[in-house]
Amino acid sequence: TNFGGVFRKANPMAAGQIAFSDYRQYVPSYDAPASFIGSPIYDDDQKIGVLIFQMPLDRITEVMAVRDGLGESGESYLVGMDHLMRSDAFLDENHSVVNSFRNPEKGELHNPAIDEALIGNSGIMTTSDYRQVSVLSAYMPVNISEGVVWGMEAKIDVEEAFASID
């Protein structure tokens, strides 16, 4: 499991180092996506254990769900290297974290902005989103841990972004 993987990574680490396991379905949580962070605990030079905690998926989604300045059609979200959601999309329930892991065929998110973010690029572009709607997109990589990058995208429909103000 990803819990066990974090333990195996964290157990041999020096004090102050952190192990991370990206989101995957986790059987003890009824196959809900789960991610873990772990670190060895030392008393002076003696390792006394490994502390592991589950990343709060709802808190990540709560932060990403802030819609200030995004108008009616805007949204922002995080996507993992597997193209599955790491926060819920606002406009389509298929693109929630839980649904994207349970049904990857419908929940995977592929678009040029996310592809660019996942290879380490930041920028702004006009592209089509998962609804096949033309959007103005700002994107960037989020370096979560060594070897783990999530793509972040904030977007709004081009029609709304360039609409005249009445």
List where the protein language model places each region.
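Extracytoplasmic/periplasmic ligand-binding sensor regions of membrane-associated signaling proteins
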Residues: 1-54, 128
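Solvent-exposed, extracytoplasmic
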Residues: 6-9, 23, 42-43, 50-99, ...
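Extracellular/periplasmic catalytic domains that process cell-envelope and extracellular macromolecules
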Residues: 12-13, 30, 43, 69-71, ...
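Solvent-exposed loop/turn segments at secondary-structure junctions
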Residues: 26-28, 57-59, 160
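Short loop/turn motifs at secondary-structure junctions and domain boundaries
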Residues: 26-33, 67-70, 118, 130-133
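Extracellular/periplasmic juxtamembrane segments that couple receptor/chemosensory ectodomains to their
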Residues: 41-49, 81, 93, 101-166
